């Protein structure tokens, strides 16, 4: 059986705040940096989700808003693929749309153009 590895290296300041997030994947053969990471793991014994959410001081609030919005949309897509629950995934996308509108990331009929004043 083939195995792949994903590795995260987090550099912390003296207050244990992430300064730098680096990650690599054995299949990608390169190392990348990121300002934020969200990891969710299913604990079978506890039947609960374990979460690791980290972001650096360099992550701007507008970037964080976009990061969360895109995660909501990605979760809807993954949920639909994993469960076949089309209607529930639509409801998740609808929530993500309203969330994006509230944060002025998207208009009622789509995304604001990049660089717009919203």
Which positions does each model-derived feature cover?
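Structured beta-strand/loop patches that form or line metal/cofactor-binding pockets in enzymes
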Residues: 1-8
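Active-site- and interface-proximal helix/loop "cap" or "latch" segments in soluble metabolic
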Residues: 19-84
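C-terminal charged interaction modules
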Residues: 77-118
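Short, acidic, Ser/Thr-enriched surface-loop or helix-capping motifs
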Residues: 12-13
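Intrinsically disordered, low-complexity linkers and terminal tails enriched in Pro/Gly
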Residues: 1, 28-31, 113-118
């Amino acid at each position: 059986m083939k195995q792949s590895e994903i590795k995260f290296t987090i550099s912390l300041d003296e207050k244990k705040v992430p300064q730098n997030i680096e990650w690599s994947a054995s299949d990608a053969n390169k190392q990348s940096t990121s300002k934020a990471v969200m990891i969710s793991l299913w604990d079978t014994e506890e039947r609960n989700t374990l979460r690791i959410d980290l972001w650096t001081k360099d992550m701007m609030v507008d970037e964080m808003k976009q990061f969360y919005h895109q995660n909501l949309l990605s979760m809807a897509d993954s949920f639909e693929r994993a469960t076949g629950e089309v209607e529930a995934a639509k409801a998740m996308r609808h929530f993500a749309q309203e969330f994006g509108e509230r944060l002025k990331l998207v208009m009622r009929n789509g995304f604001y153009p990049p660089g717009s004043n919203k």
